[in-house]
A protein has these predicted regions:
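Bacterial N-terminal signal peptides that target proteins for export
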Residues: 1-10
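Soluble N-terminal domains of membrane-associated systems
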Residues: 12-13, 26
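N-terminal signal peptide c-region/cleavage motif recognized by signal peptidases
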Residues: 18-20
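Periplasmic polypeptide-binding modules associated with outer-membrane biogenesis and secretion
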Residues: 22-102, 112, 128-144, 205-209, ...
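C-terminal transmembrane beta-barrel domains of outer membrane proteins
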Residues: 46, 243-397
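Gram-negative/organellar outer-membrane beta-barrel architecture
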Residues: 87-234, 242-243, 264, 295-302, ...
C-alpha cells in the first residue's frame, strides 16, 4: 500500500523531469504611462514580442524598438507570468517652438508648431514661418507614418514666401542678385518593402516668379521616385542610424526646358565605446541642366565648408568624425563632435570648386522633448581659408 502511494506522489515529479523545457509564453502586453499615444499604435510596434517564450525576452531589444520613435524619455519592461508589462514616460511632442540661428553668412528666426505625435498615432505635423536676412517663408506639412497593418504612408506639404536671392562664389563675391516669390506644394506616398527598405513616389508644383524675369521664372511639376534603406539602434546614449537614400526626379517645366536630377544621401553612425560614436555622412547631387533658380547649395550633400550662397548643378561631398556624449543629465545629453569634411562642386556661374577642412561643434539632445534644441559649429575650409560659424536654438530647418 505504501509503495502504491509513493508511486502516485512521484508521478508529477517524473512528468516535470520528462519536460524540462516547459516555459511560459508571453500572451498579453500591457502598457502603462501613455498620455497622448494611442495604445493600439504602440501595441503594433510590440507585436514581435507576443507569443515569445518569456526567457527569450530581451529588454534592450524592446528599448531599442521604442527609442526609434524618439517619443519616450523613460522605458522599462518586465515579464509577469504570461504578461509583458511595459512602462513608458512620454516626451513633450506638441509645442510651439521659437527658433533662431546666426551664421557668419546669414541669420534667421521664426516660430514653428511641431507635433511629432499628431493625433496620438505617431504622425508628424508642422506649421509655422520664419524670416532671415533676405527672405520670409510660411510652411506646413503632414506626414502619415505607415503602420504595420496599413498599405502605405503618405505626406503632404506646402510653402510660400519671398526672398532677395544672392548668388556668390566661394570667395563671397556677388555674382547675381534677384527678387523672387516662391510657392511649392507636394504630395507623396511611400511603402515599406522590408523592415529596413522603403520606396516612395511624389509629385507637386514649384513656382519661382522672378522680378523682371532675370533669370527666368520657372513653373515646374516634379515627379520623384526614391528608395531608402535604413536601420537604427539605441546604444544607451545615442540613437544611431545607418541609411542610404537614392532619388531620381524628372522636372517638367511649363515655361522653359524640362530637366532631370539625381540625388544620393548616406549616413553611418556607430557606437564605439560608452558615450562615443563614429559619425559619417555624404551625398551626391547631379542635375546638369538645372535652371539658376533651382540650383542647390552645399546642404544637398550635408557639408558646411562653402558659402551658403554658392549654388551648383552638380556636387559631391561628405565628412567623417566622432561625437562624444559628455554626460546624461536631467535635461538631456550635451555632446561635442569633430569631423573632417570635403566637397567638390560644379557651380552654375563660376569655375568648379573644391574644399576640405575640419568642423567642430556642440549639440544638446533634449530628454523631455522630441527634437534637439541646440547646434553650434565652426568650420574651416583649408583650400579657401573661409571660416564659417553657426549657432542655432530651437527648430532646425
Amino acid at each position: 500500500m505504501a509503495l502504491e502511494k509513493l508511486k502516485y506522489l512521484l508521478l508529477p515529479l517524473l512528468f516535470l523531469m520528462a519536460f524540462p523545457a516547459w516555459s511560459t509564453t508571453i500572451t498579453d502586453i500591457q502598457i502603462q504611462g501613455l498620455k497622448r499615444t494611442k495604445p493600439a499604435v504602440l501595441l503594433e510596434k510590440l507585436e514581435k514580442f507576443k507569443d515569445m517564450p518569456a526567457e527569450d525576452f530581451d529588454k534592450k531589444q524592446l528599448e531599442s524598438e521604442l527609442q526609434k520613435t524618439q517619443l519616450f524619455s523613460h522605458i522599462d519592461a518586465q515579464v509577469s507570468g504570461s504578461t509583458l508589462i511595459v512602462t513608458v514616460e512620454e516626451k513633450f511632442s506638441l509645442l510651439p517652438i521659437p527658433f533662431a540661428y546666426a551664421a557668419s553668412d546669414s541669420w534667421g528666426g521664426g516660430l514653428v508648431v511641431l507635433d511629432s505625435n499628431a493625433f496620438g498615432i505617431m504622425d508628424q505635423a508642422t506649421i509655422g514661418g520664419f524670416v532671415s536676412a533676405d527672405s520670409w517663408r510660411v510652411l506646413g506639412s503632414y506626414n502619415h507614418i505607415q503602420k504595420n497593418h496599413s498599405p502605405f504612408g503618405w505626406n503632404i506639404s506646402a510653402n510660400g514666401g519671398k526672398s532677395d536671392t544672392k548668388i556668390r562664389n566661394d570667395e563671397g563675391d556677388l555674382l547675381l542678385s534677384y527678387e523672387n516669390t516662391v510657392f511649392g506644394a507636394s504630395f507623396g506616398i511611400n511603402r515599406r518593402l522590408a523592415p529596413w527598405l522603403r520606396a516612395s513616389v511624389s509629385s507637386g508644383v514649384n513656382l519661382c516668379n522672378v522680378q523682371d524675369d532675370a533669370p527666368h521664372s520657372q513653373l515646374i511639376i516634379p515627379a520623384t521616385l526614391a528608395l531608402t534603406a535604413s536601420t537604427t539602434s539605441w546604444d544607451g546614449t545615442f540613437l544611431n542610424e545607418t541609411y542610404l537614400s537614392v532619388s531620381a526626379t524628372y522636372n517638367t517645366s511649363l515655361w522653359h526646358e524640362s530637366y532631370s536630377s539625381i540625388a544620393v544621401r548616406a549616413g553611418y553612425q556607430q557606437h564605439l565605446v560608452q558615450r562615443l560614436r563614429l559619425i559619417a555622412q555624404g551625398g551626391l547631387f547631379y542635375s546638369p541642366d538645372v535652371p539658376v533658380v533651382s540650383a542647390r547649395n552645399q546642404s544637398a550633400v550635408m557639408v558646411v565648408l562653402l558659402n551658403n550662397a554658392c549654388r551648383s548643378s552638380a556636387m559631391a561631398g561628405g565628412g567623417v568624425g566622432l561625437e562624444w556624449g559628455i554626460a546624461q543629465t536631467r535635461f538631456g545629453i550635451p555632446s561635442i563632435y569633430a569631423q573632417y569634411q570635403a566637397i567638390w562642386a560644379d557651380t552654375i556661374m563660376s569655375d568648379d570648386i573644391t574644399g576640405h577642412g575640419p568642423v567642430a561643434g556642440f549639440k544638446f539632445y533634449l530628454k523631455k522633448f522630441a527634437f534637439p534644441a541646440v547646434d553650434i559649429f565652426t568650420a574651416y575650409n583649408v583650400k579657401t581659408g573661409l571660416f564659417r560659424t553657426s549657432a542655432g536654438a530651437g527648430f532646425s530647418y
